[in-house]
Every structure is written in structure tokens, then in C-alpha cells.
């Protein structure tokens, strides 16, 4: 809906002017209109969120651009969070203060930029390619350290050891959708993992070596760790700005 302003020359010259006196304040826009613009500009709030806790955007924000990525969610048992607390504690003892992730997943794409009007067509493309895929088992039990491409953040993650072939199949289909929109595809040799915690800066050297061995021992000794680090991939999600779309697997 376009909002059009008219100059005084375009107004009806036959109308009589209002009598002098105090004017009433203008009425507020209808709630439906406000909601419409709130939905269209939801990426403004996202832009502020990406600056939170010192995180740095990997691409310049522009109005109408929506940060978008595809992933498989991992919803852990409560005991898994106890294991994560121990891992964060060991990292702190080695001089690295980590922030636990608020949600857990296995990435199936890089973060790309979608224009608002591309979102629904992109999601439909994903659904068309992924809706016939079956659920599969994932096991992620080996601790590993990662950094983002810009070396501005460091992550502690669990590398996937079972389910690789299925994940590669998903990525192949997601890449096809990305290519349709001339967007960057996933890494050629991906290391599928569940990110557990993160910190600002490049802390790779501090976490590797003896610290990494100590972290792995925590996992190996933790009660029922073999069941806590496995899950069934039951759906694929696409998050675009503040919108999340779910594609269930068979």
C-alpha cells in the first residue's frame, strides 16, 4: 500500500478552509497498518540483536535485508545442560569465559541475505526439495573448537560422527535452492557440529591441546553421555530474520 502526499495545488480549491481555532490532534493509524509495517521492518530489531554481547555482523545491514540460514534443531535432555555447565566450567579454568548457546542445532547453510520478498519463494523451494526426506539418527560426541571466518568469535562444539551422509544429502538440496537465488552455498568440506558455547575473539589456541583433551574427558566420563549426545533429525528449519519456517521429515 503506497502512502501518497499531495501538494496544496492538488487539493480541492472549492473546499472552504477550517475556521480559525484549536485543531484536534490527528487520529493514530489503524492497528492493522502498524502491524503491517512492523512485520515488514522486523529486520531492524534483528540488526540490534546481532550487536548484542559484542557480536559483530558478518555483512552490512540494509533495510529490507533478512539474515537467513537453514538448520536441523537439536532439543537436548535436561542432563545435557548439566554436561554443558561442566564444559563451560573447565574452559573458564583454562582462561576462556564462554557463553552457553540459547538453542542448539546443526547448520545446513551459511548465513545468507534474503530480500523480504524472496523469503516465501525461497522457503517454498526448500519444501519442494526436502519434503520427501526421511528422519535419521545423528550422534555428536567429539568436542571440537571452531572460529567464524572473520575470527571474531570462537565456538565450542560437538562434531557429528553418525549421520554424515544424510546431512550431506540435505545440504545438497539446500544448496540447489540457494543457487536458484544466486546465494552462497555451504562449505565444500563441512564439519557438521552442534555449537555449545561461544565467546568474542579468536580463542582457538587457548582451547586446543590439553584443554580440549580435558573437555573430552568430561564428556566421556559423564553419566549417560552416549544417549545425551544422540538425537533423531525430525525436521529442517529455515530462519529468516524473526520468522522461522519448519519442514517436517517423514
Swiss-Prot record:
Q: Which GO terms describe its molecular function?
A: 3'-5'-RNA exonuclease activity; lyase activity; poly(U)-specific exoribonuclease activity, producing 3' uridine cyclic phosphate ends
**One Pfam match:** HVSL
One GO biological process term is: U6 snRNA 3'-end processing
Annotated residues that bind AMP are located at 105-107, 187, 189-195
Q: Where primarily located?
A: nucleus
This entry's Enzyme Commission designation comes to: 4.6.1.-
Q: Which InterPro entries match?
A: Usb1
Describe the reaction catalysed, as an equation. Answer: a 3'-end uridylyl-uridine-RNA = a 3'-end 2',3'-cyclophospho-uridine-RNA + uridine; a 3'-end uridylyl-adenosine-RNA = a 3'-end 2',3'-cyclophospho-uridine-RNA + adenosine
Entry binding sites for UMP = 149, 187, 191-195
Which keywords label this protein? Answer: Hydrolase, Lyase, Nuclease, Nucleus
What would be one Gene Ontology cellular-component term for the protein?
nucleus
Residue spans crossing the bilayer: none
Sequence segments annotated as region (Disordered): 1-31
Hydrolase listed as a keyword: yes
According to its UniProt record, which residues of this chain constitute the active site? 105 (proton acceptor), 193 (proton donor)
The subcellular localization recorded is: Nucleus
Q: Report the top EC class in one word.
A: lyase
Keyword Lyase listed: yes
Q: Which Gene3D superfamilies match?
A: Cyclic phosphodiesterase
Q: Which segments show compositional bias classed as Pro residues?
A: 22-31
Query: What task does this protein carry out?
Result: 3'-5' RNA exonuclease that trims the 3' end of oligo(U) and oligo(A) tracts of the pre-U6 small nuclear RNA (snRNA) molecule, leading to the formation of a mature U6 snRNA 3' end-terminated with a 2',3'-cyclic phosphate. Participates in the U6 snRNA 3' end processing that prevents U6 snRNA degradation. In addition also removes uridines from the 3' end of U6atac snRNA and possibly the vault RNA VTRNA1-1.
Family assignment from sequence similarity: Belongs to the 2H phosphoesterase superfamily. USB1 family.
- This chain belongs to which protein, by name? U6 snRNA phosphodiesterase 1
Amino acid at each position: 500500500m503506497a502512502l501518497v502526499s499531495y501538494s496544496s495545488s492538488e487539493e480541492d480549491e472549492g473546499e472552504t478552509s477550517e475556521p480559525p481555532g484549536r485543531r484536534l490532534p490527528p487520529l493514530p493509524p489503524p492497528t492493522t497498518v502498524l502491524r503491517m509495517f512492523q512485520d515488514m521492518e522486523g529486520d531492524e530489531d534483528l540488526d540490534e540483536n546481532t550487536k548484542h554481547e559484542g557480536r559483530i555482523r558478518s555483512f552490512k545491514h540494509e533495510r529490507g535485508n533478512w539474515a537467513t540460514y537453514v538448520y536441523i534443531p537439536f532439543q537436548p535432555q535436561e542432563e545435557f545442560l548439566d554436561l554443558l555447565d561442566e564444559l563451560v566450567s573447565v574452559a573458564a579454568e583454562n582462561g576462556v569465559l564462554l557463553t552457553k548457546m540459547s538453542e542448539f542445532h546443526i547448520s545446513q547453510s551459511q548465513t545468507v541475505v534474503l530480500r523480504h520478498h524472496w523469503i516465501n519463494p525461497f522457503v517454498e523451494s526448500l519444501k519442494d526439495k526436502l519434503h520427501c526426506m526421511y528422519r535419521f539418527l545423528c550422534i555428536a560426541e567429539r568436542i571440537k573448537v571452531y572460529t567464524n571466518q572473520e575470527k571474531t568469535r570462537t565456538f565450542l562444539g560437538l562434531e557429528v560422527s553418525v549421520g554424515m551422509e544424510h546431512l550431506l544429502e540435505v545440504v545438497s538440496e539446500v544448496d540447489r535452492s540457494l543457487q536458484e537465488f544466486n546465494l552462497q552455498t555451504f562449505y565444500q568440506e563441512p564439519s557438521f557440529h552442534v555449537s555449545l558455547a561461544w565467546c568474542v575473539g579468536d580463542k582457538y589456541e587457548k582451547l586446543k591441546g590439553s584443554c580440549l583433551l580435558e573437555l573430552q574427558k568430561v564428556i566421556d566420563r559423564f553419566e549417560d553421555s552416549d544417549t545425551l549426545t544422540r538425537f533423531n533429525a525430525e525436521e529442517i528449519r529455515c530462519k529468516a530474520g524473526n520468522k522461522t519456517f519448519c519442514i517436517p521429515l517423514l
